[in-house]
Amino acid sequence: MSISIETITKRNQYRVDQPQRQPSRLSTVASISEYQSDYSKTVFEEIELEVIPNKQNISTRSFRNDGNDSDPQTLDPDAYPPKRSIAFVLLNSILSDMSMSTALPISAAYTEILGGTDAFSGLVIGIPTMISLVCLYPMLRFANPKSANGYTLYFRPLIVSCISQIIGHLLYSLAYRAQWLYLILIGRMCNGVGFTMFLYHKKYLTDKHFVGQNRSTFLATLNILAQTVGFMAGSFLGGLLAKACMHLTNPIWNQYTVGSWFMLFAWCIYGILLSIFFKEIRADGNDSSARKPENFNGQAVKLSYTHKFMLVFLSMVAFISYFNIAGYQASVPIYAKELYHYNAFQSGNFLSLSALVIAPLVFLSTFLSKWAEDRDMMLYGFILGILALVVHLVLDVLHKVRVQPYFVLYSAMQFGFSIGSAPLISLATKQLHPKYHILVGIIVQIGISAADTVGAICGGAIFDITTVGFIALNLGIAVLVFIQLLFLWNSIKTKTG
């Protein structure tokens, strides 16, 4: 748009004299917008400036400048990071869950042949997430250096996850050749270093620096879908490859190690592609999909008692949801072997078929975020999970747990608690000041990591605890957090999206 000299002269007659400003660091476009805004205040107050989307279909940042450049810059509610970067994060989520679940169908048999017990098998399944919890703080320091100016450098934990997963799967596969039981555990502990990415999956897809409020719940639910797909694929491949190599006697490549070798190759390919194509969002001001980290002008922002209680509540929701999920997943091969005489291949098919049923339901639930609040999704998910546990408990007491109802109840419970825990980070980022967003991610991840470890151990020892005791334990803690949800109902109301 061209502006004639006469027009500018007329405009200057109406402008209020202002002290001369120093050149701003903002772009020329932002400066023109500021000039038009000042002019519209004096003469054309009815004129509104339209935000024009850029080439990436992400609206340019709108600035509010009251003479103080430190004011926070607002982000378009529909903004999102580069699509290829979202794809790499979701693919990492899928591969991480595959690494977690590939060992499920064969873990009990693998540990038994090397002299281990069912409880040790549960430890092998659950120990990686506990290691990820221990490595969480060093990874936070590594991914958030001072040079990043408040941004998280997501490429760093992504590449660390690749390297640690490759090493972990290598050691796990060589345990049979070495005939050393604890090498399985060491390999899974190396996998645990890579599982610190479980925090960054959620954080990247809800990061307020470049994810708009209308996109956060949708992307967070997509992550749950990715986890479901990864678990389905890992369980199926673990059982299928074990069956295909059942008669092999090679100490390197056999039914116990083939799934781990497969994942090693998959992580190598992913790491190469990640290094070439992943696009990092940096604090250089050139990427219009991001906003600058906010300057809080030194003002202390304290949490209210309600917000503190909410943080405790979110951690409990994460713990109890994943305790149920991980506990049942670890118990399926043992429970089904005792009741239905399932082998590793059949157990893997059971787990993967359940995930296959859940996946489209999780996908459909991603669209609910446009109409349903985060608290509504949590409520419906927990109601479904609790009902499934109640029915399973009754059938188990009556000794009438046939395989078909067990499959339906297991799938309903998994789906319910997956959806119930999906909007935790999104809910917190909508409620709390951005200063506390990293803290929220850490608290939720602590709950998840502890639950994955403790739940897997309890699931592996299901017959030591007794089946009734195990189901009742899951039901009791789920009811506890459900009561807390009702107590906090009015305090966690948020916008949809």
Curated annotation (Swiss-Prot):
Keywords associated with the record: Membrane, Transmembrane, Transmembrane helix, Transport
Protein's GO biological process: transmembrane transport
Highest taxon, organism lineage: Eukaryota
Region (Disordered): 58-79
Location (main, coarse): membrane
Cellular localization per UniProt: Membrane
Transmembrane segments: 86-106, 120-140, 155-175, 180-200, 222-242, 258-278, 309-329, 348-368, 378-398, 407-427, 438-458, 468-488
Database matches in Pfam families: MFS_1 (PF07690)
Any one GO molecular function term: transmembrane transporter activity
Gene Ontology, cellular component aspect: membrane
Cytoplasm recorded as keyword: no
Gene3D superfamilies noted in UniProt: MFS general substrate transporter like domains
PANTHER family: INNER MEMBRANE TRANSPORT PROTEIN YAJR, MEMBRANE TRANSPORTER
Membership in a protein family: Belongs to the major facilitator superfamily.
Protein name, per record: Uncharacterized MFS-type transporter C613.02
